Swiss-Prot record:
<dbReference type="GO" id="GO:0043022">
    <property type="term" value="F:ribosome binding"/>
</dbReference>
<keyword id="KW-0694">RNA-binding</keyword>
<keyword id="KW-0699">rRNA-binding</keyword>
<keyword id="KW-0963">Cytoplasm</keyword>
<protein>
    <recommendedName>
        <fullName>Translation initiation factor IF-1</fullName>
    </recommendedName>
</protein>
<dbReference type="GO" id="GO:0003743">
    <property type="term" value="F:translation initiation factor activity"/>
</dbReference>
<feature type="domain" description="S1-like">
    <location>
        <begin position="1"/>
        <end position="72"/>
    </location>
</feature>
<dbReference type="GO" id="GO:0005829">
    <property type="term" value="C:cytosol"/>
</dbReference>
<keyword id="KW-0396">Initiation factor</keyword>
<dbReference type="InterPro" id="IPR004368">
    <property type="entry name" value="TIF_IF1"/>
</dbReference>
<dbReference type="InterPro" id="IPR003029">
    <property type="entry name" value="S1_domain"/>
</dbReference>
<dbReference type="InterPro" id="IPR012340">
    <property type="entry name" value="NA-bd_OB-fold"/>
</dbReference>
<comment type="subunit">
    <text>Component of the 30S ribosomal translation pre-initiation complex which assembles on the 30S ribosome in the order IF-2 and IF-3, IF-1 and N-formylmethionyl-tRNA(fMet); mRNA recruitment can occur at any time during PIC assembly.</text>
</comment>
<comment type="similarity">
    <text>Belongs to the IF-1 family.</text>
</comment>
<dbReference type="InterPro" id="IPR006196">
    <property type="entry name" value="RNA-binding_domain_S1_IF1"/>
</dbReference>
<keyword id="KW-0648">Protein biosynthesis</keyword>
<dbReference type="Pfam" id="PF01176">
    <property type="entry name" value="eIF-1a"/>
</dbReference>
């Protein structure tokens, strides 16, 4: 999948799950299951409930996404 195919949305982390998975509520009200991208995992970026994040969604499965950025 190329970088052009992804859908980037903003959201707020609602709940932290095991194995670095999170339930994220998007701006449009939908909830998706998100996992941390490699760079966030490598640099030990902590994501807690209530954090604003950027999520990349695949057009093939809109219920799962990758957390690529944590807002300040």
């Amino acid at each position: 999948m190329s970088k052009q195919d992804v859908i980037e949305l903003e959201g707020v982390v609602k709940e932290a799950l095991p194995n670095a998975m999170f339930i994220v509520t998007l701006e449009n009200g939908h909830e998706v299951l998100g996992h941390i991208s490699g760079k966030l995992r490598m640099n030990f970026i902590r994501i807690l409930p209530g954090d604003k994040v950027t999520v990349e969604l695949s057009p093939y499965d809109l219920s799962r996404g990758r957390i690529t950025w944590r807002k300040k």
